Amino acid sequence: MNYMIIYEIIAGILIVVAILIHFNIMKNKVAAIKSQTIYESNRLKEEAKKEAQSQKKEAILEAKEEVHKLRNDLERESRDRRMEIQRLEKRVLQREELLDKKNDVLEKRESSLDKKQQEIDKVQAKVEELYQKQREELERLSGLSSEEAKDILLEEVNKEIKHESAMMIKEVETKAKEEADKRAREIITSAIQRCAADHVAETTVHVVTLPNDEMKGRIIGREGRNIRTLETLTGVDLIIDDTPEAVILSGFDPIRREVARIALEKLIIDGRIHPARIEEMVEKAEKELENDIKEEGEQATFETGVHGLHIELIKLLGRLKYRTSYGQNVLKHSVEVAYLAGLMASEIGIDPTIAKRAGLLHDIGKAVDHEVEGPHAVIGAEIAKKYRESPVVVNAIGAHHGDLEFQSLEDVLVQAADAISAARPGARRETLEAYIKRLEKLEKIANTCEGVEKSYAIQAGRELRIMVKPEDIDDAGALEMARNIVKKIEEELEYPGQIKVNVIRETRAIEYAK
C-alpha cells in the first residue's frame, strides 16, 4: 500500500517536472521566434529604406532631366517666336513703305484728275452755251418752242409704233388662226381615222321568227285575248300579217320592244300561251333585261377603259343601248364619243382619261329624260354630280350642248367629239327622231294626269293606251280622264288623222284555296 502511494507521488513529481521542462522549451522557442521576427523586421526596414532612397534618387534625376528638357523647349520656342516677330516687323515695315508710295501716287492722280475736271467743266459750259444758242436759233427759224417740237416728234413716233404694232398683231393672229385651223383639222382627221365606227341608224321594229304559221293563231288567242294581253303589258304593237313565219314588234321605245321580244321568244319556246303565262314571261323578260342592261354598261366601260364608275351610272349606261337619238343608238354613240374625245385629248397633250370619261357619260341624261324634266345635258350633269364624278366631268356633260359655260379643254373636246359622231353619214335620221319625240310627248301628256299607272303610245301614235290605278280612278273618272287627255292632245300636239285614247281600269280579286 505504501509502495503504491510512493509510486503515485513519484509519478506526480515526474509529471510536474515534465510540464516544467516542456514549458521551458516552449518559452525558449517563443523567445527564438521573437528574436527572429525582430531581426526580419529590422532587415525589411533597412531594405525598404534603401529602396526608398534609390527611388528618391531616380525621381530626382528624372525631374532634373524633365526640367532640363522643358528649359530647352522653352528656349527654342522663345527663339522661334523672336524670329517670327522679327519677320512680321519686317513685313509691316515693307507694307508701310508700299502704302507710302501708293499714297504719293494717289495724291498725284487726284491732282491730275482735279485739273482734268476743271477742263471738262469749261468744255461742258461751252457746249451748253452753244446748245442754247442753237436751240434759240432753231426756235426762231421754225417758229416752235422746244416742248412743242418734242410733242410733235413723240406723236409721230407713237403713230408709227402703233401702226407697226397693229400690223404685227394682225400678222400674228392670221398666222395663229391658220396654224390652229390646220392643227385642229389634223387632230380631228387623226381621231376619225383611228376610230372607225361601223354602227348606223336603228329602226322602230323588230321581227320575231316563228317555227310555223300555226303559232300565229296561238299568239292571237281566243278572241284576241293573248295578243291584247301582250300589247297591254309591254306597250308594243304586234303586227301579224301574211309574212310567213314572222311576227313584227313595232314600238318607238326600244326597252319595251326588247321586253316584248324576249317574252314572245320564251312563250314560243315554252308553247303554253295564255294571259297568265304571258304576264309571267313579261315579268321574267323585264328581270332578264335588267341584267343585260348592267352587262352592257360594264362592257362599254371595259371597251373605253373607263373604270371606277358608280354602279348606278353603269346601269344608266346600259339603258342607253335601248335609247336612240335621231335613229342613232345612244350607247354606241357614247362609246364613239369617248374614243374620239380621248384621241383628240392625246393629240393636244392633256389627260385622255378624263376626256374619255366625260365622253362616255355625256348623254347619260337620255337614260332618264322620259321621267325627268329638263335638257338631257343638264340632267346628265346632275346625275354625274350625284354619283360624285369630278367637277371637270360634270361640267363637260352639262356643256356639250351649250347649257353650261365651257370651263376646261375637256368641255370643248366632248362637244367636238359629239358633233363628229352625230355628223357621220348614215348615223342619224331626222324624220325618225321627230316621230319618236311626238310619241314621247303623247305619253308624257297622259302621265301628267293623276292616277295614271303607265301609258303606251301604240299603232304608230294613232292610239294612246292608258293603265290607271283602280283604287284612285273609278269608272266615271276614267271617262272624264279620257276626255281631258283628248282635249290636251288637241291643244298641245300637231298630228295627222285622229288619235284614239283608251283608258283601261282593271280590278283583280285574288284568293288562294288552302
From Swiss-Prot:
Per the UniProt entry, the Enzyme Commission number(s) are 3.1.-.-
What's the main place this protein lives? membrane
The KH domain extends over 204-289
Stated name of the protein: Ribonuclease Y
Alphabetized UniProt keyword annotations: Cell membrane, Endonuclease, Hydrolase, Membrane, Nuclease, RNA-binding, Transmembrane, Transmembrane helix
Membrane topology for this entry?
Single-pass membrane protein
Statement: the UniProt record of this protein carries the keyword Transferase: no
Biological process, per Gene Ontology: mRNA catabolic process
Q: Which positions fall inside the HD domain?
A: 330-423
Any one Gene Ontology MF annotation carried by this entry is: RNA endonuclease activity
What is the organism of origin for this protein?
Clostridium kluyveri (strain ATCC 8527 / DSM 555 / NBRC 12016 / NCIMB 10680 / K1)
Record has Transcription as a keyword: no
Primary role: Endoribonuclease that initiates mRNA decay.
Which Pfam families does the entry link to?
HD, KH_1, RNase_Y_N
| Top-level taxonomy | Bacteria, Bacillati, Bacillota, Clostridia, Eubacteriales
TM segment ranges? 3-23
